[in-house]
């Protein structure tokens, strides 16, 4: 499975047409050989430098969810607070994602209580192993929360675990080709995308051709 992080309201500017452009552009390079899940970011209030990040509006998420269905794509999101977790749990989603933030890990039990799987990015091998043993519906991904991150740091931290699951913040597909992870996540952007989630570690449709 390939999870593409479409970002928050920052990347799409909460614009329905830009959301459609992002999804259309993915479909144009998708050969249909991989199980692709579109993942957004849902939160109410996250500070960023000297301002707050632009949250994805619920109506925009709904539009993205419905629009992606026309291509057969499943849509979900990372959640950063209880309110957005409850909001997302009302949708038919393949899983609910938690970022590599220790304060969010307790939500994995709440997610399980809603009947959904939890995919959780973790920053060390010990926690990866613990979550693997916790419950079959809690799925960890190896993650280095640097933007961009170095492949060396992933290898040093996770070595032989990356074939199970990888949230990739490097700038190329070296780790993907080397470890062939069962679940692979990376950020997604268009050539003209802006915002904190559209850095050099985010992949364009043209770049995704390498693995699709």
Cite the ranges covered by each PLM segment:
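Catalytic cores and adjacent flexible loops of soluble metabolic enzymes
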Residues: 1-212
């Amino acid at each position: 499975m390939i999870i593409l992080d479409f970002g928050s309201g920052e990347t799409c500017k909460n614009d329905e047409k830009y959301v459609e452009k992002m999804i259309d552009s993915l479909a144009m390079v998708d050969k249909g050989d991989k199980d692709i899940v579109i993942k957004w970011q849902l939160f109410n209030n996250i500070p960023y430098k000297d301002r707050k990040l632009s949250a994805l509006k619920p109506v925009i998420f709904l539009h993205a969810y419905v629009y992606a269905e026309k291509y057969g794509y499943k849509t979900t999101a990372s959640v950063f607070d209880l309110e957005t977790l409850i909001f997302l749990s009302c949708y038919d989603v393949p899983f609910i994602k938690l970022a590599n933030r220790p304060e969010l890990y307790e939500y994995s039990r709440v997610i399980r209580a809603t009947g959904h799987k939890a995919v959780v990015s973790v920053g060390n091998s010990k926690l990866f192993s613990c979550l693997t043993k916790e419950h079959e519906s809690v799925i960890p991904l190896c993650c280095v929360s640097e933007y961009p991150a170095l492949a060396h740091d992933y290898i040093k931290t996770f070595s032989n675990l990356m074939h199970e699951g990888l949230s990739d913040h490097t700038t190329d597909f070296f780790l993907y080709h080397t470890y062939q992870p069962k679940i692979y996540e990376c950020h997604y952007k268009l050539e003209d995308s802006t915002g904190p989630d559209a850095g050099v570690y985010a992949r364009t449709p043209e770049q995704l051709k390498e693995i699709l």
